[in-house]
C-alpha cells in the first residue's frame, strides 16, 4: 500500500515575506534559549515550550489557510500576529535568563 502524501499549495508571496521577516529573529532567539535552557527552571522551560507549540500550531493553520486563500488579508494579518507573539514569547523567555 502506498502511503498518502498531503499536497500543500505553495504560499503566496506575501506570506513568504512575513515568514522571512520573522525568521532571523526567531532563529537567533531560539538559539540563545537552547544554549541557556539549563539555566532556567525546568517548569519554566515546559511552560515556554507548551506556549510555543500553541503558537506554532496557529502559524501552521494560518499558513495552510493562506495556501488555500492567498488573497485573504485577514489571514495574513493573523499569520503576522502569530509570529509577533512567538518573537515576544522568546524575548521574554530569554529575559528570564540569569545575568552573568
PLM feature segments, named:
Residues 1-100:
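Polar, acidic low-complexity tracts enriched in Ser/Thr/Gln/Glu with frequent Gly/Pro and Thr-Pro motifs
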Amino acid at each position: 500500500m502506498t502511503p498518502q502524501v498531503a499536497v500543500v499549495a505553495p504560499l503566496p508571496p506575501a506570506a513568504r515575506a512575513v515568514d522571512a521577516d520573522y525568521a532571523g529573529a526567531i532563529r537567533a532567539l531560539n538559539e540563545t534559549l537552547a544554549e541557556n535552557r539549563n539555566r532556567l527552571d525546568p517548569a519554566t522551560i515546559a511552560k515556554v515550550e507548551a506556549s510555543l507549540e500553541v503558537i506554532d500550531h496557529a502559524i501552521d493553520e494560518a499558513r495552510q489557510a493562506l495556501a488555500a486563500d492567498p488573497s485573504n488579508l485577514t489571514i495574513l494579518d493573523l499569520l503576522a500576529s502569530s509570529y509577533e507573539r512567538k518573537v515576544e514569547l522568546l524575548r521574554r523567555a530569554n529575559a528570564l535568563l540569569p545575568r552573568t
